[in-house]
């Protein structure tokens, strides 16, 4: 199995490449938090070729296929079971990148932003998945409000068809 095998499950090759670009910009021993781990595709993209990065994967239940994906690639992450909000309320250290792809309701995305964005270091990254997908309108609304409130510039985006699925912002 290689990293691009993941695209056949959840990610396009463009998404894999985009996350790999950002991974290379993270500092040595970076802290990465993945909200909504499921198949661990985003975690794998960030960790692949960067064994120094410490990854925390948050999800409400254990997905054995996701753990198997990481193991097959020789990667590992600290798995935190429960909601991102529960873990966010207890979190107490800075992070270099947060990837928000958990509960796709407007309220949950907004709460993830409120709980996790303050922990992102200057020059760190905030990534959102499923922006612009018709079945998750709350995601785009929460992200648009985030951009208006914080003013962080769009760093990278990608998508398929007419949808801008992945949006990454850099903390100024």
Predicted regions and their residues:
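A short alpha-helical cap/connector motif
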Residues: 1-172
